[in-house]
Amino acid sequence: MEEVIVTSAIIGKSASEIADPIHIVSGDDISTEATQSLGETVDDLLGVSSADYGSAVGQPIIRGMSGSRVKILDNGIVNRDVSGLGADHFNDLDLGNAQQIEVVRGPSSLLYTNGTIGGIINVVDNSIAMEDVEQLVKVGGETQSVNEGNTTTFFYQDNLNNLNVSFAYKNTDLENYDVPNGAIMHEEEEHHDDEAHDEHEEEHEEHEENVGFLSNSDFASESMKFGASVVSDNGYLGFSISSSESSYGIPFHGEGHEGHGHGDEHGDEHGDEEEGHDEHEGERIFTNTDSDKFDIKGSYDLDGFNFANSVDFFYRDSDYSFTEQHAEEEHEEEEHHDEEEHHDEHEGHSEGPTTFTNDSAEAGFIFDLSNDLYSQKVSFNLVNEDTAIFGSEAFMNPASREEFTVGYYLSRSFNGFDLDLGVRYDTIDNSGSVTSAHEEEHHDEDEDHHDEDEHHDEDEH
């Protein structure tokens, strides 16, 4: 039987030699599973779970920590999306061509990025080949009955005149997934008069909804990636271009609009429980994402130099946008057309989209200083990142961030013990604007005055 050696791209050791808390999920295990989120892919591992928010969103949790405490890496480089800014924001990574997924905890995680108290998850593919490849063609298809979903994949790689090229494509279309009748329960607030209130002993009553499917649980995405590299005795050099678009619903997000903090006020204004429920019954909450990345990556053997064995280097330019929007079905819009101005009176009930953008450029070097006694690496990173939020639910002003970091990792085994040490120094410069409380109050007064003018005009008519 042929021996298969799995090596960590982070530490550079085989799985049997690694003393760090690390899990490696192979590409074969990923490809045999149904299309699912990153969190669901790794939640069977020890100490790892997933915070699911529909079929598209599954944020990994490592040792009880998630969000900004767990960093997601794409081929050793931080995936700079906006998944850390909301529970319903998904990790924008394509697992269709993943060679392996590494879950790393411990000192070695500090070598690649800051804020990794929980750990890192590194998704590795072979788009920029580090060794010469042979011709390989893969065509795949998947059908899911629970959501009438279909997924098609295509992968091609070859060595053309000493140039390694690869192309990967994936298209996924999943509809709302089926649930047993009566599986979805709602808690409705009592808005009846005292006579109706006396008929019920509890403030809330539960009722079953025979819908047969979970609304806003759909997911659709399309991604492609092209890479090329040249390999020599001294190392390799290559580049890759990737693009992905996705759209997915956010289930249970809009019931009574409780998650937006104005459901009670809106319900009280209507006064009738049934009417308030029907108003949001056909609401559609969905998200669109768009991501483009350009990578340059390579490695050079420094044999003959006394200070280092080799140096790995990379550069990435990425543009990412995430748009969340509320909408109502056509019949609902017609039914409430006359109440359109009335809805605008309630602060925060705007149906306009909210867009998150993140544009970043990152460069780094990792020097291998290992010898026969110990393994050690030193990294240098430079990041320039611009983040902005626009729209009806924007909660921060545009901001720019510049980082310069130095990381150090040391590992040594002696007398049956393993010593691992990680050190990281960060210089971070944040710039942006601050909206004062006085400006916010003045803005609210202007909105209230504008609403009063609209009411006055309505009374005249």
Range-by-range predicted roles:
Residues 1-31, 67:
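Short, acidic, small-residue-rich periplasmic hinge/interaction motif at the N-terminus
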Residues 39-78:
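Extracytoplasmic beta-strand/coil segments of soluble accessory domains associated
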Residues 78-105:
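Short acidic/polar hinge/loop motifs at secondary-structure boundaries
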Residues 96-100, 105, 110-185, 218-222, ...:
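Outer-membrane beta-barrel translocator/receptor signature
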Residues 139-143, 158, 167-173, 230, ...:
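Transmembrane beta-barrel strands of outer-membrane/channel proteins
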Residues 145-173, 185-251, 286-303, 370-374, ...:
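Transmembrane beta-barrel wall of Gram-negative outer-membrane proteins
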Residues 215-217, 221, 235-311, 317-332, ...:
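Flexible loop and strand-edge segments within Gram-negative outer membrane beta-barrel domains
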Residues 374-461:
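Signature of Gram-negative outer-membrane beta-barrel scaffolds
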